[in-house]
Amino acid sequence: EKGEFMAVYYLRDRFELLDSGTFWLSETPDKVSRGWDGACNRTVTWVELKDRKSGKEFFYFNTHLDHKGKAAREEGVKLLIEKIHEIAGKKAPAIVGGDFNTPVDSPIFKPLTKYMVSARAKAATTDHKGTFNGFGSAPDTIVIDHLYYRGKLKCQLFATLDGNYGAPYISDHYPIAMVFTL
């Protein structure tokens, strides 16, 4: 009924949760809803965290754009940007990550890359592995999962976590990660 859940996991001994919320990628983001030409109800879950060591704060937005609707992906990115400005302001450090169901060179990212940078492209250490595996049925070159950031963050590492975790595939996507400093 409500659609998918975009979980955000964090180390509670390292970070303090200051605020959190969810919105739907649709024309009515505050209501359970399916947007534009989307096949599914899609959401964004966000958190505001405070680093217990440094006292610095940042925002993280986790999303999953629609896999079928092109307009849903395009409008979803625009809404995501609007909500980041509304929730985090225009300057606070922020990270956006998730399954965008869109290759990195797609024009869908143009509005996002006007004020955020790709962790994969800017990290001091990165990889060029595919992120979608289709439970073994897809070529290992498809990259549709992304991390973007803005503000006073420095990205040291971007990694596609394609190791064996006790099963050949834990999902149809490999997890992605970034290591950063505030």
Predicted regions: what they are:
Residues T63, G97-D99:
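Active-site flanking residues adjacent to catalytic metal/cofactor-binding acidic residues
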Residues E1, K68, N101:
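Glycine-/small-residue-rich active-site loops that bind phosphorylated ligands and cofactors
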Residues A39-N41, K50-E74, K78:
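Metal-dependent phosphoester/phosphodiester hydrolase catalytic core
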Residues M6-V8, V44-E48, N62, H146-L147, ...:
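Conserved hydrophobic/aromatic beta-strand scaffold that supports enzyme active sites
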Residues R14, A71, E75, H85-A94, ...:
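Metal-dependent phosphoester-hydrolase catalytic domains
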Residues E1-E57, T160-L161:
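Structured beta-strand-rich core segments of catalytic domains in phosphoester-bond hydrolases
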